[in-house]
């Protein structure tokens, strides 16, 4: 809702279709040696990307393999096919770092364009 009126939702993908697309994309492009799984959570205009990652430190400490779920990225829908990409800071807050199309934002996460997303 902007300026007290309704805003037309003209996203190309939305709802379950968008979630299925993102889950398929993240599993295809983000799974690596230290990333076992990914999960998408949608809430309002935000899409959160989580990853289950290998915890080297805890594994050495306990002698058992330890995997933790981490916040990787947040996509905030602006309008049309425009999103704002944010990373999760060590302070526990989200920080915006890029705006662009859904594909551009996902590519930035995949390539770790700013060195902000895959820090574990």
Which sequence ranges carry the predicted segments?
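Short, compact, well-ordered microdomains
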Residues: 77-120
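Short, charged/polar micro-motifs that form catalytic or ligand-binding hotspots
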Residues: 8, 65, 92-95
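Negatively charged, low-complexity tracts enriched in Asp/Glu with abundant Ser/Thr
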Residues: 1-61
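Generic structural motif recognizing short loop/turn segments at the entrances and edges of beta-strands
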Residues: 36, 43-47, 71, 81-83, ...
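Intrinsically disordered, low-complexity regions
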Residues: 5-6, 45, 64, 80, ...
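Short, conserved beta-strand/beta-arch hydrophobic-aromatic motifs that form part
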Residues: 50-84
């Amino acid at each position: 809702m902007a300026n007290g009126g309704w805003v037309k939702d003209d996203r190309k993908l939305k709802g379950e279709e968008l979630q299925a697309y993102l889950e398929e994309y993240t599993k295809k492009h983000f799974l690596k040696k230290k990333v076992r799984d990914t999960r998408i959570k949608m809430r309002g205009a935000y899409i959160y990307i989580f990853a289950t990652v290998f915890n080297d430190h805890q594994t050495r400490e306990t002698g058992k393999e330890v995997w933790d779920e981490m916040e990787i990225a947040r996509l905030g829908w602006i309008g049309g096919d425009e999103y704002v990409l944010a990373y999760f800071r060590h302070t526990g807050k989200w920080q915006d770092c890029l705006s662009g199309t859904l594909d551009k934002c996902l590519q930035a996460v995949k390539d770790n364009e700013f060195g902000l997303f895959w820090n574990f």
